[in-house]
Amino acid sequence: MAMYLKSQAVLTLIPQRYHALARKSNAGRRCSLTPNSATASQFFQKAASSTSTKPPGPSDADVRSPASPSSRSSLRPESIPKPPQSPPVQGQTSPGSEVLPPDHESSTPPPPPPPPQGPKSSRLRKLLYLFLTAGLAYAGGVWYSLRSDNFYDFFTEYIPYGEEAVLYLEERDFRNRFPHVTKQINRRVTVPKDEGAQVTIPSGSGLSWKVAEEQQEATDMTKKGRRMGTAHANEPTKDIKVAEKAKEEVKSKSAAKKEDVAANIPIQEDLEPQPAKAEERNLDAPRQPAVPAATTIERLVQDKVDEPVVQDLVKVFNDVISVISADESASKFAGPIAKAKEELQRIGDRIVALKKDAQESAQEEIRNAHAAFDKSAAELIRRIDEVRTQDAAEFREEFESEREKIARSYQEKVNTELQRAHEVAEQRLRNELVEQAIELNRKFLSDVKTLVENEREGRLSKLAELTANVAELERLTAGWSDVVDINLKTQQLQVAVDAVRTTLENSDVPRPFVRELAAVKELASNDEVVAAAIASISPAAYQRGIPSAAQLVERFRRVASEVRKASLLPENAGITSHAASLVLSKVMLKKQGLPTGDDVESILTRTENFLEEGNFDEAAREMNSLQGWAKLLSKDWLADVRQVLEVKQALEIIETEARLRCLQVE
């Protein structure tokens, strides 16, 4: 900052210095300072480069403005040494004017300091980051609302302007996906109505005051229906105001509809006019008026035509008839009106025929389009079915080949294991037979020795008894073969059961035991009890495996923590209830021992104690007594425990059956 102030002071003193030197050297002469020297230009370039760093603005309170050289600057013009005067240059127009070179010592200022960092920039940066983060979060919420229905409900209900933003994006997406819909809507442009030429009504048409005073009141066809008799037309006028009112209405209607009449009534030259029907006269009238009554013209009725254009044309024509009927010279227009009626009737019939033809052609095109679409759809379905059938055949062949490979590999493994087990059992049986033969020989020798000694003592008195013993030994030796076969099968069954139990107990992860179970089933093929026990095991259990006891306990601890979090939730819980239950579950104290009660914490404590004791049956019963969210969360764990219990029960039944066989042999 000090260097910057010093450079500003030097730049301020430069013009004053030159001005003071010029005044002292050329007193009373005209001073013309022109910055044409190379030294002056270099000085100004260095000064400008030294001050290229933007100084702090006047709004910064910590930075003061540089002081003027006349008041606060420490550098005075008098303290600057004067350079020697340069010799006069030839050809100079003003002998007294000169340009002094700047001082080179002060032209090299030190490097400018770094600009100070104000606190406002950091605040603006934080505010900008906050706005960007909020905008990104809002945009992300709008995008995720289009993907998730649950988040859509939350976002549109609790976020301001969330519903409008989501609806706007959905509308934009709809317009991008179906652009032809908006184009068809924009194509519906209202066609301007051709008003046609103006129609001039004669000045003598309409009602007059003489008709209201002398003649009977004319019938208002727009209010009385489509057809009226002459008896209503001959009724006397009761009030002059009624005629004046009718005259004003007729004039207003004629002025409003005169342009529509000229535009909507088509001119057909090929139609011949037909004479109008003469109206029936009422012969029972009490008297004849002095002035003939106004002729009433029958209005046109088009009930069969539903076209809006024809109905509007008929309405305009009926208004014209009403205007003519209200005039005293209505009889003059009876013929043209009748001709116009016939032409309008023909026009309506022609429009109906054209509409019917257009509808029939449109229906024919629709039927043709439907037939073509059905044909193309059937062809497409046929192609899809062919491709699907081909793919299914290829997939079936691949599946059969893979299944055969897998079955072959598993069969080889099973045969290898069975062969090894059979060899081990046979070797064990041979060893036992050798031991039993040795024992029998030893007993036989001891018996023979005893008999020989007894014979020696009894002098052949017990020879018959010795013969009986030998026969008994032969019988026992012959019966031992059956015992050996039964023992062999029992031992093989026990080995297979031990293999299943070892597989279940020594596996760190659930492993399938299909091969071991198949070996047990093959060894006990004639035993119905073993077959029923194997059938009671779920196929998913021996195909995927079952967890061990340690895995069940570890998983129960994780499930128990989640059940404690949801223990305080009602049936129809929301976000607030979930949050409250999560917070309160952290505060709840765990029970110890065997607590009594049906609350979630007591049930979890008892279940954990039963699991530590190895009593999975009671643990499953305790967890099955849970209700609501707790039971829903522990559903998968209960299914695993049930599979473990089913497998253990089946293995216990098979082991019991094997022991029973041994007892039967004994």
Curated annotation (Swiss-Prot):
Biased composition (Polar residues): 33-54
Species, as recorded: Ajellomyces capsulatus (strain NAm1 / WU24) (Darling's disease fungus)
Subunit: Component of the mitochondrial contact site and cristae organizing system (MICOS) complex.
PANTHER family: MICOS COMPLEX SUBUNIT MIC60, MITOFILIN
Ranges in coiled-coil conformation: 337-482
InterPro entries: MIC60
Mitochondrial matrix topological segments: 20-126
Protein name from the UniProt record: MICOS complex subunit MIC60
Bias kind Pro residues: ranges: 108-118
